[in-house]
Amino acid sequence: MSAWVLPDHIADVLPSEARHIEELRRGLLDTARCYGYELVMPPLMEHLESLLTGTGEALDLQTFKLVDQLSGRSLGLRADTTPQVARIDAHLLNRKGVTRLCYCGPVLHTRPDRPHATREPLQFGAEIYGHSGLEADLEALQLARECLRVAGVRDTTIDLADMRIVRKLLAGVALSPQRLSRIHAALAAKDAGELAALTHCFAADSRAALLALLQLYGDEAVLAEAEKALQRIDGISPVLANLRWLASRLEGAQVTFDLADLRGYAYYSGARFAIYARGASDALVRGGRYDEVGAVFGRNRPAVGLSLDIKQVVGVVPPQTLKAAIRAPWGEAADVNAAIAELRAAGETVVCVLPGHESEVDEFHCDRELAQVSGRWVVQAV
């Protein structure tokens, strides 16, 4: 095998794309800061039990594992940053009241989570801890929309669901993990035949409600249909009211609902959202409420958050036009170096042309040059 061949779904990022990624990273972190989020930088590697505690089987399967040569303990390379941020909130900061944290860094996956995806996403995320009200859910949605706007993503659709609906329908039913997994799969695939077979011994109301879920997707009219179809199930009306409240406050947004969507079922504890955009094969942003995420670290605080893969977003939006640069001659003279330093301090990109490479070009388009005119160094058009 050639030494330059990389593993499957791992790739080098070349200059043009790297510039786009870095510009977007800066823009997203600046946006989060404008909303009051503080930046944290968890390590890429942690003890395995810290990374996986309370996160479910899916994250376990996505996590690369290795043995620490110093301690002999099992380590993991993070596949998701949220558990680490929950640990920071619960154990290191240990603040009272609301805490807003954001992060941006690479994660590693043992398998790509969608066709043609990288196994090394650059994950950006933001978390709100300490508020159980819908105001925090709404803020996470608003921040997610603003992040996509900053990235240049247009024509988005927000899909809302709530994990509590299915949990209430399955409450009191004794199910093996295998059967529960099959029920989840049938709901996700909207397979009425399989779901009917798996729930044949359920109480009539629960079975009818589960089968009705398969048709409960679409615009806001779905919520009214759900009120009728699920009226015999205790506690459903407040959940639907919460979804209606959130949707009504997303001004100018196209909002849909899929009440059988169970992605993140083992993770989310309430409302969850996904934002789709034209040209993207999967959701660009996912988020929701996961109130139990910090319990394993000693603080069971309300929590809402969102995350996205910057590399995925970059793939669906055109890069910003690169600001034209200034070409300058390489030299040791103090006057030319002073002129170059002054231009760079003013925010200009100045590319020094090395001797013998005057005809070479790179990513930077130079529409001006630094030239000596009448003993002075001046910038003039090329």
From Swiss-Prot:
GO BP annotations of the record are:
histidyl-tRNA aminoacylation; L-histidine biosynthetic process
Q: Membrane spanning segments where?
A: none
List the InterPro entries hit by this protein, alphabetically. Answer: aa-tRNA-synth_II/BPL/LPL (IPR045864), HisRS-like_core (IPR041715), HisRS/HisZ (IPR004516), HisZ (IPR004517)
Keywords (alphabetical) are:
Amino-acid biosynthesis, Cytoplasm, Histidine biosynthesis
Give the principal location in a single coarse category: cytoplasm
An example of a GO molecular function for this protein is: histidine-tRNA ligase activity
Q: Please give the GO cellular component terms listed in this UniProt entry.
A: cytoplasm
- Entry keyword Cytoplasm: yes
- Write down the Gene3D superfamilies for this protein, in alphabetical order: Bira Bifunctional Protein, Domain 2
Where in or outside the cell is it found?
Cytoplasm
Extra remark beyond the main annotation: This function is generally fulfilled by the C-terminal part of HisG, which is missing in some bacteria such as this one.
Q: Which family does it belong to?
A: Belongs to the class-II aminoacyl-tRNA synthetase family. HisZ subfamily.
Q: Which HAMAP family match?
A: HisZ (MF_00125)
State what this protein does: Required for the first step of histidine biosynthesis. May allow the feedback regulation of ATP phosphoribosyltransferase activity by histidine.
Q: Quaternary state and partners of this protein?
A: Heteromultimer composed of HisG and HisZ subunits.
| Name assigned to this protein | ATP phosphoribosyltransferase regulatory subunit
Name the source organism: Verminephrobacter eiseniae (strain EF01-2)
